[in-house]
A protein has these predicted regions:
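Cysteine endopeptidase catalytic domains of the caspase/legumain-like
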Residues: 1-204
Length: 204
């Protein structure tokens, strides 16, 4: 398999270099991946690269977004709370439904890992994905929560790697550390949620 990574760091609206540091930390921890870092891309630029990666059956792909997130009124009626989650991009908002639909349409890659360290980053609802096989979703907080930052990194990204050892994520410890920031990380693997488990094995 060919290991490919796409990491998006949106530095505007006061986030600064912390989100770039988050992206680079993932790249540093995954040296076996050939990674691309996109700083403040347009929605089209980001999605074009993502589609090119997930459409190839030989690829193992990790897609990470480090950005602002927000909620807007749900127009399609598919959200229980009446709100859609969005990634704030340079040229506008990317709604969760559009991103999920795009992944469902083009995904042919062997394995896909989605990482989001953004506010309201329950943006990836595993129930909305058609194919759960070899799909891992790791997000920094639940839909109604915000993601906090330390000076140089996002709280979630830094604590994620502090709690990840030898292929195993200590979910209990990660939750404990982020509880102080009022963040509830969301972890789903192959269609099963591990939010309240002690630990989970993650394949990168």
């Amino acid at each position: 398999m060919v290991k490919k990574g796409l990491f998006v760091a949106n530095t505007f609206m006061g986030l600064g270099e912390a989100v770039v540091n988050d992206a680079r930390l993932f790249m540093e921890k995954l040296p076996e991946y050939s990674c691309q870092l996109m700083r403040n891309p347009t929605t089209k630029e980001m999605l074009t690269v993502l589609i090119s990666l997930i459409s190839k059956p030989e690829n193992d792909v990790i897609f990470g977004v480090f950005s602002h997130g927000q909620q807007v009124r749900d127009i399609s009626g598919d959200e229980a709370d009446g709100k859609d989650e969005c990634i704030v991009m340079k040229d506008g908002l990317l709604i969760d439904d559009k991103l999920t639909d795009l992944i469902n349409k083009y995904r042919k890659c062997n394995r896909l890992t989605l990482v989001a360290d953004i506010c309201h980053s329950g943006i990836y609802d595993f129930k909305d994905f058609i194919n759960h096989k070899n799909l891992t979703i790791v997000t920094s907080c639940a839909d109604g929560e915000t993601s906090k930052q330390f000076v140089k990194n996002g709280c979630f990204t830094l604590q994620f790697w502090n709690c990840f050892k030898n292929g195993t994520l200590n979910v209990q410890e990660l939750r404990r550390r982020l509880m102080l920031m009022h963040q509830t990380p969301q972890i789903c693997v192959d269609g099963k949620c591990y939010n309240k488990c002690a630990s989970v094995n993650l394949v990168f």
